[in-house]
Amino acid sequence: MHKNSSAHPAYTIGKLVCFSTLVIGCYSHAATTQTIAQNSMTPSPMLSYPTADAQLGERLYPNEAMYSQQIGVELEKLIRKRDAGGVAQRDVHAKAHGCVKAQLTILDQIPANLKKGIFSRPQSYPAWVRFSNGSHHPERPDKKGDARGMAIKVMNVPGQKLLEDEPQASTQDFILINHPVFFANEPERYLSLMKDINGNLLKKAMIPFALGFKGTKIAFQTTRSKIANPLQTRYWSMVPYQLGLDANRSAVKYSVRPCTAQQDAIPKHPDDNYLRAALKNTLSNGSACMEFLIQPRTSNAMSVEDSMTEWKESDAPFYKVATLQFAPQTFDTTAQNQMCENLSFSPWHALPEHRPLGATNRMRKGIYDHISKVRHEMNVAPRQEP
């Protein structure tokens, strides 16, 4: 049915995975695999595995921390095999449409229960925003169906952060995809998926069985997406986050959408990089605006452990809490593109008020950190927050 196995929806799933999908590592010149091998295959010992917040509905899966470590090993295998002797690319979201400057402005008139963390008072923060395709292929044509990513790094955010090895970082990251739900919940299921992806053709054929019917359906829906302009697309966090601290904490999800309903048409004969061209055209000729939204959970039936089920807006509406303003700019330069690849995004680059929730997010902590370090080491590149 498909001419190319990597275009098959079931295979593309592996390129979407949140544990390294939404993570954005940094790359420079590659070191040899032999040089780095002695430091590989184990997550950072500096990072503790997250505990579960039972009050917000979190629960640890059996052997979750072990599965997390094994998933990190499988993702590292994927990177080392694909990028042996070359520049270590991201395991997924390898193709950026651009890293652009933005201003995140927190609004004054927002519900009192949402005024927590960086949303606690009206203020503006500079930010970097990276738009990307979900695939692990950096040369994959934009016209092919794919997940589309948006990673926001908010700068100059005071306060101690959650990552033990970067507590004084001045950044707060938000990671989003243009689909509201993820395709897997259980750590064991995801590990099975990664082993199938790293296996032979027979193993790859087992991917739909690893995901199950619902997971395969979600993955297919996510990876068939085609868009005209990254700035005219809506994005979701897919997984939940804590908002606030102590007795005032709650579970929420995030979304970012354009300020207007304007939609460009996809070119009749799009070239392979038409999304970068659309981004350049928009910001060369004017500014752009997007809205940052928070969706508070309204019922405990909205599980923080079930990232495969959407919190329906009819039951839990989103509230606008901030705007992202993109001033006219030139971003497609060698220096800025390199800077973009040297950025690393993680949902755990966060204030305690924005702690990630759920199994997907818990596993992301160590996996993102491990894969980021592997890539930096392979590329002999410094690893630090801007």
Where do the protein language model's features map onto the residues?
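Short stretches within intrinsically disordered, low-complexity N-terminal or propeptide regions
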Residues: 9-12, 32
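Active-site-adjacent core segments of small-molecule enzymes
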Residues: 32-386
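N-terminal secretory signal peptides that target proteins for export/translocation
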Residues: 1-10
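Sec/Tat signal peptide C-region and signal peptidase I cleavage site
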Residues: 27-29
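Bacterial N-terminal signal peptides
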Residues: 14-25
